[in-house]
């Protein structure tokens, strides 16, 4: 038998074939990383949401409304909308990973884990900005609700939680266990840290679900208690008003927006009640009639009756006018809390309420396109309705 020379074997592997194989491996690793990072982000977002005053179910429903429009919105988030929101979020995170390691792989694929991490965090800023400022409210989705409903920092947190898993690519791109030992050590430690974080957030969420949140950490107990009581009462009236519109509004889109108001404010009140019981270990007292009358934007009984009794052809206009007044009052209250020395969780939640309710005023008045983006950016920075 004739022996084949080693040089002949090496020559049979052409440079073009080797490059193609590397590209395939890179794209496969990018897809694997996308699945890991998007799943990690979903888990962290779900477990952490309530700790900063977010109702995860409402947020997933809002995300589902990006591609599914009004179908996804209901007064109580449905499982189909929640799952659609999670699926759309994971698809988006998966796609950003493919861009980072696939499309841009010529520059990113061979980096060390720590270098990837240092680049991934600015990438999270870029990708979340692209979604919030352009891809969702403008081309290709033309859906202003997401940007007007959720302040930018929520998307930044979500994208950051995905980006922190990018260093695992430095191990995934090597086939057959050929990854350098330093990459293996780094990624082993990184995976351990990620699992520990999930366990910590899971335990915190479990205790929170049973009424044991991390303790109150504000500076003025009376001020924080007053804010929670007042905003809970204010939201309760907003829910009652929105429920009327969810049944009576002539414009189908306005009906759906009213349902979203019910869902978001109901979720906020659940969080307020959980925090109150956990922090202060007592039932939340009702607001007195004098307190209600003094709240900005709180409606009188006569105003509520006027909306209920409005003729069908006048209802939408009256509801938008009345709810805009009510929302403006909540914006003022939330803005005061944001600038106070209250518990950080209350302040973060207040910032989101200020943004959300100004955004809903804009949506009721038909904001869309670049005007919606401009309005959302201004709303994120301050009170623009009082």
Question: Locations of the language-model features?
Answer:
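N-terminal signal-anchor transmembrane alpha helix
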Residues: 21-54
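Interfacial helix-loop-helix junctions of multi-pass membrane proteins
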Residues: 51-55, 132-156
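Hydrophobic alpha-helical transmembrane segments
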Residues: 83-105
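All-alpha RGS (Regulator of G-protein Signaling) helical domain and cognate RGS-like helical scaffolds
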Residues: 183-386
């Amino acid at each position: 038998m004739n022996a084949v020379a080693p040089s002949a074997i090496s020559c049979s592997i052409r440079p073009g074939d080797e490059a193609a194989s590397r590209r395939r491996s890179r794209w496969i690793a990018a897809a694997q990383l996308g699945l890991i990072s998007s799943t990690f982000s979903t888990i962290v977002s779900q477990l952490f949401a309530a700790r900063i005053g977010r109702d995860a179910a409402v947020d997933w429903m809002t995300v589902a409304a990006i591609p599914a429009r009004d179908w996804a919105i209901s007064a109580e988030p449905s499982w189909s909308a929640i799952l659609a929101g999670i699926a759309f979020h994971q698809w988006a995170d998966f796609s950003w990973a493919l861009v980072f390691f696939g499309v841009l792989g010529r520059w990113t694929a061979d980096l060390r884990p720590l270098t990837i991490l240092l680049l991934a965090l600015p990438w999270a800023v870029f990708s979340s900005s692209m979604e919030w400022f352009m891809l969702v409210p403008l081309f290709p989705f033309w859906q202003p609700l997401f940007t007007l409903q959720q302040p930018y920092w929520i998307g930044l947190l979500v994208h950051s939680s995905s980006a922190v898993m990018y260093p695992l690519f430095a191990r995934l791109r090597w086939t057959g266990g050929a990854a350098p030992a330093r990459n293996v050590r780094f990624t082993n430690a990184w995976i351990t840290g990620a699992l520990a974080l999930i366990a910590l957030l899971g335990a915190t969420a479990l205790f929170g679900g049973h009424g044991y949140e991390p303790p109150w950490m504000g500076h003025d107990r009376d001020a924080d208690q007053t804010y929670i009581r007042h905003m809970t009462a204010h939201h309760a009236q907003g829910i009652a008003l929105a429920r009327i519109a969810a049944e009576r509004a002539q414009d189908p889109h306005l009906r759906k927006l009213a349902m979203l108001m019910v869902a978001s404010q109901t979720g906020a009140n659940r969080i307020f009640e959980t925090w109150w019981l956990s922090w202060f270990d007592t039932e939340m007292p009702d607001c007195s009639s004098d307190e209600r009358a003094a709240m900005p934007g709180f409606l009188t009984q006569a105003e509520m009756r006027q909306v209920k009794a409005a003729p069908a052809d006048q209802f939408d206009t009256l509801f938008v006018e009345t709810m805009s007044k009510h929302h403006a009052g909540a914006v003022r209250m939330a803005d005061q809390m944001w600038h106070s020395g209250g518990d950080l969780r209350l302040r973060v939640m207040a910032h989101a309420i200020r943004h959300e309710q100004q955004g809903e005023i804009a949506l009721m008045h038909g904001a869309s396109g670049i005007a919606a983006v401009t309005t959302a950016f201004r709303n994120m920075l301050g009170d623009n309705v009082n």
